[in-house]
Amino acid sequence: MIRNVIIGLLAVAVIATGYWGFQEQQQSQILTVQAENGYQRAFHELAYHIDQIEDQLGATMAMNTRRQLTPSLAEVWRLTSLASEEIGQLPLGIVDLSKTEEFLHHLGTFSYKTSIRDLDKEPLTDEEYEKLEKFHDYSKTIKNDLRKTQAMTLKKDMRWLDLNKEFQAQDEPLDNAIVDGFRTMDEHVKGASEVEWGPGMVIRNDHEKKLEKRLEKRKITEEEAKEIALSYVDMEQATDVIVSETGDGLDMYSVIIDDPERQAHYYLDMTQQGGHPIWFLQERQINEQNISLNEASNKAQEFLEEHDKENMQLVDSKQYDSIGVFEFVYLEDNVRVYPDTIKVEVALDEGDIIGYEAMSYLVNHHDRDLEEPELTADEARERLNPRLEVMEDHIALIQNDLGEEVLCYEFFGVINDETYRIYINAEDGEEEKVEKMQEAEPVYDFD
């Protein structure tokens, strides 16, 4: 009898274990499909919005009245913002798109500042029309390069997650149609950096110029750069560490570390002034998930504290296959300081830090004298759409469209099952920014 009971219990345990394994595998497949869907959506929407930018710029050059020019330039600015966001959503850390991003920044700044100007009193100058023509020419180049890359990916049925795996497994420079297409695009738009865009439209990357002003004067040595890099990747010593100086732009050290024990490579850039790591990436095979997203977020927080990044609050977390991506902002007197942002990636198989990006934090972090808000949270809430069901609120410092820091109330709310983040100016009650929060891509099962 006891024997039968034991056999029965073992059978139930085996079935339960099998069911749990099936559930885990199914959940992993769902996350994988969601991640791939997100990448595909961002890529094709990027191509679509670049198309629209080129068309809108072409139409703008033919206009001659403020009634048409102002909304047209505002639309260019809106599309440019969308395109920049979509580039940021793609897993392109292995490709340098700095020139393309710089071009979009210049175009966005020009179109925004021009659209809010009284064009009846201060019409576009001949010089500004020349800039529009150059913007149009470069946007056409980007559009054509993107279309070629898009056609190639559709023809070969290429997947973005395969690109990530290919990158992790590579020993030589990655040879991939997607990567080659984006490299070609960035190479073609390099000429845009040689154009003098006028006041406020600097050739050097704005972030790099601001960062250079904030950094300590003393430059570290290559040996010091090596020691700092090893501490960030949690290694005391390595058999092979290559430190080299970067070329144009901000003076930086690029560090490559070989870790035979983990079968991994590390890539890291840091400033020569002060030795501040800007980003690093660990390249290795990521295996099945062993730790939860919550455990990974704690490891990311501990990593920041170990490297003197105190008072950082987790504001967003996402999971892509077996990788957790976490966004932290600096917290000052209970105010979320969004310009001071750091992103950390954690491998969910071993719980180690595999990615770090701190450019925004390094550029913007400084001592601030935050003023008390003029409005209360309840007064700010009255400025919201009455149909919005508010779920949570915070006090936050953000950058407006002109790059100015503004103290706001941050509200998360729902309308018709859609989640929004809305910023209300804490001084005058104006609506500073409205963002629709991203949702997980749907997974369709036709089996």
UniProtKB/Swiss-Prot annotation:
Q: Which UniProt keywords are present, listed alphabetically?
A: Germination, Sporulation
Pfam family membership, one:
YPEB_N
Q: Which domain of life is it from?
A: Bacteria
* Any single biological process term in GO: spore germination
Q: Tell me which family the UniProt entry assigns to this protein.
A: Belongs to the YpeB family.
Q: What does this protein do?
A: Required for spore cortex hydrolysis during germination. Appears to be required for either expression, localization, activation or function of SleB.
What this protein is called in its record is Sporulation protein YpeB
Species name: Halalkalibacterium halodurans (strain ATCC BAA-125 / DSM 18197 / FERM 7344 / JCM 9153 / C-125) (Bacillus halodurans)
